[in-house]
């Protein structure tokens, strides 16, 4: 399993965002603590046996650490993002150039059709689950379906109401376990029609708004088939424990890398799906509304 991350050297919160209420320039992240948290995430991936690629950061692109948003990838084709926030729009050309060097073929949407990568387009078996309504235009879905030659399941995101924060990307609303055909989802993130549509292709386990708001649903699923190594040769304690558990309990499907703020209830639901939760403190990135999945582009 190949993953692309970007060093957090220039990560910052420099403005308010009308949709992402986590962002407050009066509560900016601690750069050194963010780097430590990001380093642990990289180490866990590396010691689980994943192929980790690291993109060098660009000083003025303070959000590019959230590599999941760069586009959607199937095979060697990449449909690059058209970001809604102005501050992120230069990321697309940078990552397109970076991915070309890795052998990928970048494609671009017409101007005015917004799309924010794996934040909203999540590969799920032979389909693509695609959120729209806040950061991704509904018109983008037809382009994704045509280019990737996969059925796209349109899922409209909605205001959850009751003073709750908007879950502006699909990846903030659920953990998508394609091999288990299961999604652990905060159902209030989707319209009723979209929820019914998702129920036709996945088993849905309800999660709390609190776990969604803490970005604990913004998690990376690592199947057992992608994990390599042995627990006694791994230095990171969490990765070592994962290797040990997978060796002891063959029925486990893999691990789910999630936030250290994940509730006990959520951890039990992950375990019920035969995955082991591996938690990482990513509190500095929560200040920008991001979690483990946002920080990780699965190649």
Predicted ranges, named:
Residues 1-299:
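The feature marks the mature, well-folded catalytic cores of soluble enzymes
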């Amino acid at each position: 399993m190949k993953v692309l991350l970007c060093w957090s050297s220039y990560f910052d919160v420099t403005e308010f965002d009308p949709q992402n209420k986590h962002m407050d320039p009066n509560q900016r992240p601690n750069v050194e603590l963010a780097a430590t948290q990001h380093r642990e995430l990289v180490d866990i991936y590396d010691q689980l046996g994943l192929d980790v690629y690291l993109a060098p950061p660009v000083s003025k692109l303070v959000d590019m650490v959230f590599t999941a948003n760069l586009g959607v990838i199937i095979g060697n084709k990449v449909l690059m993002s058209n970001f809604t926030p102005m501050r992120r729009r230069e990321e697309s050309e940078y990552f397109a150039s970076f991915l070309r060097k890795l052998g990928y073929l970048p494609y671009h949407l017409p101007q005015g059709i917004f799309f924010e990568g794996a934040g909203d387009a999540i590969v799920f078996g032979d389909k693509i689950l695609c959120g729209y309504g806040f950061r991704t235009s509904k018109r983008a879905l037809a382009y994704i379906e045509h280019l990737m030659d996969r059925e796209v399941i349109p899922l409209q995101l909605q205001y959850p109401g009751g003073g709750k924060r908007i879950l502006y990307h699909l990846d903030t609303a659920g953990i998508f376990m394609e091999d288990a055909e299961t999604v652990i989802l905060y159902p209030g993130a989707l319209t009723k029609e979209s929820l019914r549509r998702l129920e036709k292709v996945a088993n849905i386990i309800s999660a709390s708004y609190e776990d969604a708001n803490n970005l604990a649903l913004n998690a990376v699923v690592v199947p057992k088939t992608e994990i390599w190594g042995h627990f006694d040769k791994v230095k990171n304690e969490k990765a070592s424990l994962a290797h040990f558990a997978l060796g002891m309990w063959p029925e486990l499907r893999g691990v789910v890398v999630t936030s250290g703020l994940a509730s006990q209830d959520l951890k039990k639901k992950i375990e019920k799906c035969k995955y082991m939760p591996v938690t990482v403190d990513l509190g500095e990135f929560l200040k920008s509304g991001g979690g483990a999945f946002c920080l990780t582009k699965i190649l």
